[in-house]
Amino acid sequence: MSAGGNRTQTAVGASISIAPLDHVAGDVAGLLGNFLFDLLGMFYPRQICSKANVVVIELVTNVMEHCSIRDGALRVDLKIDGDELMITVANPATEDEFKAVSDRFTIIANAEDPRKLLADTVYRRRIDKAKGGLGLMRLTAESKFKLTAEYEQGFLVVKALFPMRGFA
Amino acid sequence: MKVLTYGEIMDGGLSVFHSVAKLDDHHLILTFEGVIRVDNPYRYLHTYLEELAKVLPRQSVTETTMDFVKMRFCNSNGFYVIMDIVDAVYNLVPGRVTVRRIADDDWQCETLPILLNLSEEHIAARTNFEDVKAP
């Protein structure tokens, strides 16, 4: 093992694809999140590994709970280096599904105080235990990710970006 | 130390989360260990919540520690059940509440205070945090 160099500048990339979604029978979100947590733990501080873990679990859970095109593919891509952590999760979606997600992203992206948005939403929805969007809100409020959603060739593509300033 | 009650989440035949309520003299200790990632945690923890509602009012408690240090992850599906457990403590026993958490953990430092409802003055006034290094 090399003792030289700055380990928190290590470039790591991973791409995982699973198709069809319908064949998934277990906790795929947890498996992928924990795998990436352990892999990044070789190079990066625990706090960064936890961010990757949380974003993969929340975004993949969203896919497994809401994706209606079950014969399509789930794609998870991770890229990290000294500058940024970028995680992309893609799944097949109808234009209507993309529109619904996109509206939610707009609300989250426009929030002046993401933490207050998360808190207000949790308290408001607690009565009927409604979920819808809490996972996305926590990624901006808690983990400080910048989220974007795009529609590319029939796929909903969600990108979560965390600038590594102060960590690398 | 007397165990008052406990709750557990099983996933794929394995225990993935458990919470135990213990009494050490007049000190109530609630531990939270593992991960909450299942779709419907109430399916596993509703009995625990019912038991807490029954046993806590019968105890003589002067202080409480809620220990989250070994709770590595809680996805958004688990937010409400954590709120219900901590509510049981704040509503059913008196005294100060110490919350043990990991110092540099995003979910424990950013979201957990929301779930504790620290925006309520009477809860904030009873609560202090003990930040520890990750185990």
Give names to the regions the model predicted.
Chain B
Residues 1-72, 84-135:
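STAS-like cytosolic regulatory interaction modules
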